[in-house]
Amino acid sequence: MTLTNTSDAVAIAEPILEQLEQAWNAGDGMGFAGPFAEDADFVEIRGGHHHGAVAVGRGHEAIFSTIYAGSTVELQLEKARTVGPGVVVALVHSTMTAPSGPMQGVNRARMTMVIVEEDERWAITQFHNTLVSA
C-alpha cells in the first residue's frame, strides 16, 4: 500500500489506537500488545525499555494486575503523517485515570509511535511514552 497523504496516515493510526484503548480498558495486556510488531521497542513513562510484542504484553499484564488495576485510558490522535513508503509516525495524547496506587488520579502522557507495514498489516515498531507534568 502506498500512502499519499495525511488522511491515509490517520486511517492507519486510528484503528491501532482504538485497539490499544479497548485492550487497556479491558485490562488485557496481551490484547494491548496485539498491534505491536514482533520485534517492537517500547519505552515507557519511566524510561524502561521492553523489546518485542510478547514483552510488551507481559509488562502490561503485570501492571493491569497491580499498579494500574481498574485504570482506564483515552487516546487521542494529535497528528499522523507518512515519512516514507509503508511508514507512519503518530503523535498521541493519552489520559489515564487510575483508581489507586502510585499513579492514582488523572495522568496525561504523549506518545510517539512509528507504525510500519509488514506482512500485510500495520504494526507499531517503535513506541515512546512520556508523562506530561501537571
Predicted regions and their residues:
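Short beta-strand segments enriched in hydrophobic/aromatic residues
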Residues: 36, 94-96, 128-129
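A solvent-exposed, acidic/Ser-Thr-rich amphipathic alpha-helical stretch
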Residues: 10, 16, 29-86, 105-107
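Short helix-adjacent coil turns
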Residues: 20, 27-28
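A short hydrophobic beta-strand element
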Residues: 85-94
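Beta-strand elements of well-folded, non-transmembrane domains
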Residues: 96-100, 115
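A detector for short, charged/polar N-terminal pre-domain segments
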Residues: 2-9
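Short beta-strand edge/turn micro-motifs at domain boundaries
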Residues: 108-134
